[in-house]
Swiss-Prot record:
This is GATA zinc finger domain-containing protein 3. The gene is gtaC. PANTHER family: GATA TRANSCRIPTION FACTOR (PTHR45658), GATA ZINC FINGER DOMAIN-CONTAINING PROTEIN 10-RELATED (PTHR45658:SF128). It comes from the Eukaryota. Keywords: Metal-binding, Zinc, Zinc-finger. SUPFAM superfamilies: Glucocorticoid receptor-like (DNA-binding domain). Residues 75-86, 340-358, 365-379, 577-587 have a biased composition (Polar residues). GO terms for molecular function: DNA-binding transcription factor activity; transcription cis-regulatory region binding; zinc ion binding.
Length: 587
């Protein structure tokens, strides 16, 4: 069978004999359900050929045809993915990729050297007597410890359930400014001092082992001797069987100084004989087939270190703590990691540090805000208005009001002085000065008595305003109106014999000219008479009324006749003249 060389980011350096991984490798996703090896990188510029690099060379010279299992190793390319395809890739008797999804790779002598960041992986199999196994080597990227650290995941492990890839990771060379990832489903894991190749290396640390890690000096960040970029951030995301097990664990390996150890959403299964779980990561043993992800949170260790027995922090430490907290919040928002604000925990755990005032010590920790006794509130709740306040509001004496206001200001001063004296006595814990206390209380009492005296004097004073005028009744109003009307009339005594020739009234404001001459008609009748004469003159075109002429003639005759008679009255008219005048007035 011809060898098929697959372009891959995994390569082997022939000169050094050390298997290195492309610096741009970011994500290694092993999907156990589909047996897909997904390699995600940014730049694949390595031309892998037979002469220069040996890229996961699967030698099939001594393959057993009975072990053909038709497994497809597909590497696909979408945006940042390249697709690899190799059908019927069967190794010799040692490495079997079978339908049970078991990848049993015994990887021994895994030394992680922080000086050159090279991982020497020698794949030695006891069941393999063929030299072709040297061509099928699992290439692991150089582990530059990152803020997210090395966490548990689903991937490749040996058949005994122990992952030996990261088993010799020395945590003493990892800077101690990382985040602790806590998962309720993870047991108490060993510290950096007792990690051995036979121990499952669960990187979740318990709180009892923090002190030994925090007290150790931070080591310098690892730098690769073969890397040309010191700040090259490389990330290895190892995801387990996402479709079957729902346990996704992201192991972010970067080159930052602040290194975080993160546990993701569950623990992988390190049993090599399990059909659904093939582990690459820290958790090399155990089984987690639960479909519900566990809830994880991270606590900054630098803040936990500052929480001592006495919980006392200086202002400089508080400022550094706030800066570190802001940086960690920004980093957690970038990585999607929830953080716990330990500043609030510190304040809650030390309530006595909130205030050290004597009032708080005397009354208890009720409030950390102290109000000065000299500050008067703008508005204070008032009770019901007393009758005395009602009398004071109705009092119109301006001078007494001014005196009352002065007394109230005086009593306000005395009360504030008394409260200040009590406050200082409690703060200084001096409770023996009773004479001064009594003196200040007497000042307040005497001022209140003066205010009462002023109120009593103001009440006894007569009002300075006039009494309100009494309202007259309706009958009185009518009588006053009648009196006023009568006074406006001009009365004429009946002895004179003057009266209106039309209505017969003897009282009128003014006598008017009528057909009998001057002052023969009352005011009302004279107005009607003059108005009707004007209308008749207008209707007749300016010619005099014949009736008027007749009336005038008759009046003249009667007057001349009456003048001759001794018993005649000047105001006596004939019936005809009276009818004519009444007709004019009535019209």
């Amino acid at each position: 069978m011809n060898h098929q060389y697959i372009p891959s980011p995994i390569y082997s350096d022939q000169n050094s004999g050390v298997h290195n991984v492309n610096k741009s490798l970011h994500n290694l996703n092993i999907n156990n359900g589909n047996n897909n090896y997904n390699y995600s990188n940014n730049n694949y510029n390595n031309n892998i050929n037979n002469n220069n690099n040996i890229n996961n060379n699967i030698n099939n010279n001594n393959n057993n045809n009975n072990n053909n299992n038709n497994n497809n190793i597909n590497q696909y390319h979408q945006n940042h993915y390249d697709q690899y395809s190799d059908n019927n890739c069967n190794n010799s008797n040692s490495n079997n990729i079978n339908n049970n999804n078991n990848i049993n790779n015994n990887i021994n002598n895994n030394n992680i050297n922080n000086n050159n960041n090279n991982i020497n992986s020698n794949n030695n199999n006891n069941n393999n007597n063929n030299n072709n196994n040297n061509n099928n080597l699992l290439k692991i990227p150089q582990l530059n410890i990152s803020p997210n650290g090395v966490g548990g995941g689903n991937g490749i492990s040996n058949g005994n359930g122990v992952n030996k890839i990261f088993s010799k990771l020395d945590l003493s060379k990892v800077p101690n400014s990382y985040q602790l990832a806590h998962n309720s489903s993870m047991p108490n894991s060993p510290t950096s001092s007792n990690i051995s190749p036979s121990t499952p290396t669960s990187m979740a640390l318990n709180l009892s082992s923090l002190k030994s890690i925090l007290d150790s000096p931070p080591a310098a960040p690892a730098h690769s001797a073969s890397s040309s970029h010191n700040n090259d951030h490389r990330t290895l995301n190892i995801n387990g069987n996402h479709h079957n097990n729902n346990n996704n664990i992201n192991n972010n390996i970067n080159n930052n100084v602040n290194n975080n150890i993160n546990n993701g959403n569950g623990n992988g299964n390190g049993n090599g004989n399990n059909n659904n779980n093939n582990n690459i990561g820290v958790n090399g043993s155990g089984s987690s087939n639960s479909s519900s992800p566990s809830i994880g949170f991270s606590i900054p260790l630098l803040q936990l270190k500052q929480i001592g027995i006495n919980n006392q922090t200086s202002p400089s430490q508080q400022s550094q703590q706030q800066q570190q907290q802001q940086q960690q919040q920004q980093q957690s928002q970038h990585n999607g990691i929830p953080l716990i604000n330990t500043t609030e925990i510190h304040q809650r755990s030390n309530p006595s540090s909130a205030t050290n005032s004597p009032r708080a010590l005397y009354y208890g920790n009720e409030s950390s805000v102290e109000n000065s006794p000299f500050t008067t509130p703008l508005s204070s709740p008032r009770g019901p208005i007393s009758p005395r306040a009602t009398i004071n509001s109705s009092m119109s004496n301006l001078q007494s009001n001014i005196r009352v206001e002065e007394q109230w200001k005086k009593i306000e001063y005395y009360v504030n002085d008394l409260s200040h004296f009590i406050y200082e006595s409690i703060r200084n814990k001096d409770y023996s000065n009773l004479s001064e206390l009594k003196e200040k209380i007497d000042e307040v009492v005497n001022t209140s008595k003066e205010i009462e005296i002023i109120h009593s004097i103001a009440k006894s004073l007569p009002p300075q305003t006039r009494a309100r005028k009494k309202r007259s009744t309706k009958a009185e109003k009518l009588q006053k109106d009648l009196i006023g009307i009568k006074r406006s009339y001009v009365t004429t005594p009946k002895s004179k014999g003057t009266y209106c020739i039309f209505c017969g009234t003897m009282e009128t404001p003014e006598w008017r000219k009528g057909p009998g001459g001057h002052k023969t008609l009352c005011n009302a009748c004279g107005l009607h008479y003059a108005k009707n004469i004007k209308k008749e003159n207008q209707n007749n075109g300016g010619s005099p009324n014949p009736q008027q002429n007749n009336v005038t003639t008759t009046t003249t005759t009667t007057t001349s006749t009456s003048t001759n008679s001794p018993n005649s009255n000047g105001n006596n008219f004939s019936p005809e003249s009276a009818m004519s005048v009444s007709k004019l007035i009535s019209d």
